[in-house]
């Protein structure tokens, strides 16, 4: 395997799970998230030689993923899938664990946030370091901490509204 292939394989192994979760946060759909993750890594492969080391390579990959998701949403014009998802969940033969339900509800709540809030909270959930999140989102680390605090409060409010239903 040549150097580029080896480097790409390492990047994919290290970042694919986080990129999937980031994409899932945008789409709320596993198939679309997988497609967007694949598209992201195709772009990474195509542009790997052009990476200029001006930031961490993972930051560069996150930015590609975010731009890919935003392009997708612009083209697809986000569809309301809550009713379909609920129908599928109600009619699924397999029992769903309480943890899976909570994770599903969390992503449903995240999808209610504004775009920049979705990006930030998804990266926080994927345990990306704050300095890197600040760089990706283009804000100071201090401002990031305030935003995260506010996002958590909004998520709690949204989650509590769903829990009451």
Model-identified regions with their sequence ranges:
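Structural recognition of an alpha-helix C-terminal capping motif at a helix-to-coil junction
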Residues: 21, 35-42, 55-67
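DNA-recognition helix of helix-turn-helix
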Residues: 70, 137-161
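A short, charge-rich alpha-helical start-of-domain segment used by transcription regulators
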Residues: 1-21, 34
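Internal acidic/polar
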Residues: 78-103, 129-130
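A short pre-motif secondary-structure segment
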Residues: 120-121
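Short amphipathic alpha-helical boundary/capping segments
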Residues: 7-10, 105-113
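Arg/Lys-rich amphipathic alpha helix in sigma70-family domain 2
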Residues: 50-52, 63-82, 99, 150
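Sigma70-family region 2
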Residues: 2, 39-56, 75-76
């Amino acid at each position: 395997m040549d150097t580029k292939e080896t480097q790409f394989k390492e990047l994919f192994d290290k970042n694919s799970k986080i990129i999937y979760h980031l994409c899932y946060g945008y789409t709320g759909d596993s198939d679309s998230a997988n497609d967007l993750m694949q598209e992201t890594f195709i772009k990474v492969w195509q542009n790997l030689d052009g990476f200029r080391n001006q930031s961490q390579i993972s930051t560069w990959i996150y930015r590609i993923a975010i731009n890919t998701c935003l392009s997708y949403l612009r083209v697809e014009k986000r569809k309301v899938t809550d009713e379909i998802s609920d129908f599928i969940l109600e009619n699924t033969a397999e029992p769903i664990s309480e943890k899976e339900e909570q994770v599903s509800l969390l992503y449903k709540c995240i999808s209610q946030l504004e775009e920049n809030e979705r990006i930030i909270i998804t990266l926080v959930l994927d345990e990306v370091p704050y300095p890197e999140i600040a760089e990706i989102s283009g804000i100071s680390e201090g401002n990031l901490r305030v935003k995260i605090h506010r996002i958590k409060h909004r998520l709690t409010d949204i989650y509590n509204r769903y829990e009451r239903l």
